[in-house]
Amino acid sequence: MEFLFLREKAPFACCVGEMGFALRYCGAGFCLRRAERGKAGMFRPFFVSCVESAKGWGWLYVEKVVFAKHLFVLKRYFYERCALAKKGRYAIPERKNLKEAIMIDFKVDESLCVSCGACVKDCLHQALRMDMYPVMVDEGHCIRCQHCLAVCPTGAVSIMGTAASDCTPLAGNIPEPRQLDTLFKGRRSVRHYKRENVSPALLQELLDSAAYAPTGSNAQNLLVSVVDDIAAMDAFREAVYLRLDELAETGAMPDCQRRAFFLSAGKLWKAGGWDGIFRSAPHCVIVANAKNATCVEQDPLIYLSYFELMAQARGIGTLWCGLLYWCLRDVLPDFLLRLGIPDTHQLGYAMLFGYPSINYRRTVETRSALVRHIGWN
């Protein structure tokens, strides 16, 4: 994931002090500062749905150890501490690539290591070699995939500040195939939602799970923008339809996919509140990828697939929103910056989500894909 500073003149003031940062992290915009009330040593983040409409505090206590991890990354992420942040005005300093920012810090507990060489064998770019025990010979070749940590049979390896004791063992914790199969078959596109915010804790759980989605070359350059509040979503929705109506009325609608739909969408919204794009969803998540990423188009789709499956497993409805994607890409690209997507990133896709107002009772039958079993002589 990439950190994105809030735009200059963001309409709130905080984070000038111990942290000195206002940032977006893992797709949820927030800044951390010491809580004025509450448990000693705790912090509260300020969630914002849009960098230009930050209102009110969203309360969530963060344990010291979690805060320390954020600070660990921040200290290594910027060439200079953000002394530029003053009185609520934030400039964007020169940034490092996040992969380069986190120290590799490869360590082996020799009392646990059995010198099996599994970590060396599985290292894609041969950054490790055996010298009685595994050693890191070229940090420049390490892509931070952490396979060495995952494959070690005795838990002797730690890397990037993470040890085996910090991880979840796979044995006994993988869902039964039948359960996964039911989840896949029971996944439905949801177009009817309750007018209710998804709880911040649950939303963060979904984002944390989706962060494990693979990216090409382990680039991890995705940028995730989340509209996590109904009021912000209503404002976003209204702005989209009013702009579409304006373009239709002035004859300025560009040639684009689903142009006929966009020509009428704004008028139908103004006439009777017909929400053909957003389906009255309370939230949306929009994923972009760095334009220089290895798999610029594929990575966002994989991320959203992870997000969707975890969401539906937790009772949250989702909808792949091609209409919003086409609208932002082809008709309203100027909205991207307001959604926290800079020119360095390419729009990947959009997904609506929220508590469903309709319940599906069973799986359905679907047509199988055309499969060809290939022999090669």
Q: What residue ranges belong to the model's regions?
A:
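Short hydrophobic targeting helices and cationic amphipathic motifs
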Residues: 4-6, 26, 32, 47, ...
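Cysteine-centered motifs
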Residues: 14-15, 26, 31, 50, ...
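Low-complexity, intrinsically disordered or signal/transmembrane-proximal segments
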Residues: 25, 61, 70, 77-79, ...
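Targeting/processing segments of secretory and organellar proteins
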Residues: 39-40, 82
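Tryptophan (W) side chains
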Residues: 57-59
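Short, Lys/Arg-enriched N-terminal segments with co-localized hydrophobic residues
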Residues: 77-103
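Acidic, surface-exposed loops and disordered segments
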Residues: 96-377
